[in-house]
Regions:
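Active-site glycine-centered loops adjacent to acidic/histidine catalytic or metal-binding residues
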Residues: 8, 48-49, 85-86, 151, ...
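A short helix->loop->beta-strand "cap" motif at the edges of active sites that frequently abuts
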Residues: 75-80, 176-178
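Binuclear metal-dependent hydrolase catalytic cores centered on His/Asp/Glu-rich metal-binding motifs
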Residues: 116-172
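Active-site regions of enzymes building and remodeling cell-envelope glycoconjugates
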Residues: 108-111, 121-122, 145-146, 162, ...
């Protein structure tokens, strides 16, 4: 089994811009999927924020992202696990109403992670909010796995180039892991055992 980690995709970014859709289509068609096939990858772990808009979906964005991304995953036989990010959820402090679950249920090989789970030898943790904060902290405390995938807002990391985040969770909470891979911040960065993947574009 070979795994590909994919950061925030934000389908529908910039007011559902056609230019951005074309750019994304080129990336997935010319770079991403050919690289997966060449390397024999069969699983994708997507680290949150599949869609950009929290409140609704633009039908053009849905049609386009299905055509150049989700349909390809299904057709080529990849399995994808996507954990919920803050842009995927309707309510600010709960994950129960979310766009990936509502929009992608027809894809049997795409699995949406709404609560902390163990995937092989790794913890997979969705966006932390008031509703699941206790559950997530207890899950981390009890974990014996070396790896963690999440969508974390951590203090001391760059939100964008040169702009440091001063809010959110202290990274020491994740110190027990050998390696943590996270979505959320769009700038790639690496500090200690924590790596932010950044956006793929």
């Amino acid at each position: 089994m070979k795994i590909c980690l994919l950061g925030d995709t934000h389908f529908g970014v910039r007011n559902d811009s056609k230019i951005f859709h074309k750019y994304m289509e080129n990336f997935y068609t010319e770079v991403f999927f050919p690289a997966l096939k060449e390397r024999g990858v069969d699983q994708i772990i997507q680290l949150g924020d599949l869609f950009d808009r929290r409140k609704y979906i633009n039908f053009y964005t849905l049609e386009q992202s299905k055509r150049y991304f989700f349909d390809v995953i299904e057709r080529e036989g990849f399995v994808m696990y996507s954990l919920l990010g803050n842009h995927d959820i309707f309510w600010r402090e709960k994950l129960d109403v979310n766009s990936p679950t509502l929009l992608l249920e027809a894809y049997k090989n795409i699995h949406i992670i709404q609560e902390p789970v163990v995937l092989d030898n790794a913890d997979v943790i969705p966006w932390l909010c008031k509703d699941n904060e206790k559950q997530i902290h207890e899950f981390i405390d009890k974990s014996t796995r070396p790896y963690c995938f999440g969508h974390f807002e951590l203090k001391g990391f760059e939100m964008s180039k040169g702009i440091e985040n001063h809010e959110g969770m202290d990274p020491s909470v994740l110190a027990k892991y050998k390696q943590v891979f996270s979505g959320h911040f769009h700038t790639k960065s690496n500090k200690g055992n924590i790596m932010y993947l950044g956006t793929p574009y």
